[in-house]
């Protein structure tokens, strides 16, 4: 008897479970975007995100790190709607892994690499060109930049120094950081005598000063591509359009 009574109850419970869940009201719909962005984008992007939210009521949360780390996180399934890389290589990598929407990819902006020193350093107005002796300039100190094997700023730095004939002598003095902001911090704290970072980062840290600029033709062009991810929400389209607009400049 027990079996005969329980069977219908079991069936009814599953029938109830199978009913589609009611759609949330429009006000409860998810109005957020997650942006994975190169560390060097932080200051400018924080401002742009605030402006976009004020305009659209879509809240934007950004995660800043080295482009290499972000691309790997996307590959591992980390949730994000937008990816902004500090070089084309890691965006190409993400394209190959099918983690971005190629149709949405555009080049957003550019940058420069500069030589920096702590603000109280006596070094100034360093001419950077062929035969530039970076190793001698650093003395007994370290030279900070991003990991030259993975972090875009480090890759640009190595390319420039190789072209200028300064890499071989300077290589042993390098302190490789996980991101451009980490390299910047080493110089700002006085833990490195010199650093090679993006101009935009150097300008926002009062603890450092720019003492030289690398010739544009000494390294590949510094381009920041942006794209929606393969799993992006629909609001990502409006965000991308905003980043390219005059309002975000």
Residue ranges with predicted function:
Residues 1-11:
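Bacterial N-terminal signal peptides
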Residues 16-78, 85-88, 92-249:
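Exported/periplasmic ABC-transporter solute-binding proteins
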């Amino acid at each position: 008897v027990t079996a005969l009574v329980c069977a219908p109850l079991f069936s009814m419970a599953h029938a109830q479970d199978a009913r589609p869940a009611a759609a949330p009201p429009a006000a409860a719909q998810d109005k957020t975007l997650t942006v994975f962005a190169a560390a060097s984008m932080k200051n400018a992007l924080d401002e742009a995100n605030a402006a976009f939210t004020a305009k659209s009521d879509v809240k934007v949360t950004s995660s800043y790190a080295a482009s290499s780390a972000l691309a790997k996180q996307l590959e591992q399934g980390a949730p994000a709607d937008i990816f902004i890389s500090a070089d084309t290589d890691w965006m190409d990598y993400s394209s190959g892994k099918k983690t971005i929407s190629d149709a949405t990819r555009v080049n957003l902006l550019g940058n420069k690499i500069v030589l920096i020193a702590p603000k109280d350093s006596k070094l100034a107005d360093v001419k950077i060109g062929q035969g530039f002796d970076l190793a001698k300039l650093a003395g007994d100190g370290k030279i900070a930049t991003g990991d030259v094997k993975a972090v875009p700023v480090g890759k640009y730095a190595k390319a420039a120094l190789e072209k200028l004939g300064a890499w071989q002598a300077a290589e042993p003095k390098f302190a490789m950081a996980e991101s451009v902001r980490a390299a910047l911090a080493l110089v700002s704290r006085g833990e490195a005598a010199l650093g090679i970072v993006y101009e935009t980062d150097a300008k926002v840290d009062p603890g450092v000063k720019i003492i030289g600029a690398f010739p544009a033709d000494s390294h590949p062009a510094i381009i920041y591509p942006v794209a929606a991810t393969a799993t992006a929400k629909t609001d990502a389209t409006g965000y991308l359009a905003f980043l390219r607009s005059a309002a975000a400049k």
